[in-house]
Structures are given as C-alpha cells and as structure tokens.
Amino acid sequence: PINPNLTRVQAEGGILQGIGMTLTENITYDKNGYPAENSLFQYKIPARNDIGHIHVEFENSYEPNGPFGAKSIGEVVINTPLPAISDAIYNAIGTRFYELPITPEQIAMAVAAKQ
C-alpha cells in the first residue's frame, strides 16, 4: 500500500526543489568547465525554514495502470512552482523573466527600470 505521510513529505520536498530551481539555484562554470560552486555555502538550496509551511493535500482517485492504483507525483510537484512564481512576479511588477534563477536583485532592477 501507498504510505500517505511519506507521499506528502515527498511532495513537499519536490515543491521545495521547484522553488529553489526558480529562485536561488544557480550554477556557473570556470574556464575548464568545472562547477564554480563546490559546496552548499556557495550553491544555495532552500531549506524548510527558508520557505515556511507547505500544506499538501491529495484527492483520492484510482489509476488502474499504476502500482496499487497510484499515480506519479514527482514531476508534478517539481515543475509547478516555476510557472506559479514567475506569473506571480509578472502580475506584481509587469516584467517577465526568461532565465533562472529569478533573483531578488533582478526583480529590484526590473522595478527600478520601470520608474
């Protein structure tokens, strides 16, 4: 059987990864092609205390082709924060961003450019 608590935690983790991909995670490379960020001091991934509480609920349904009637959740939860956050920023300041991460500095510069 599917463990709902484990599934909920997996969904929370995927959402957190999607938020990190959208807002903080940036990798750069040196002239030899090696990552310049070689530790978590340099490569910022969000932690639970950076984001706050994520409330996850599931709708019961049965998928006859999935194991035990289950559906995949990994792709859904990691891919949905990007469009949600980028559209929220667009609705707030009227600027679209086409590269990740969308940093606070980029948002501030976009707001300043409109003034």
Name every feature range the model reports, one short phrase each.
Residues 1-115:
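C-terminal catalytic domains of large/alpha subunits in multi-subunit enzymes
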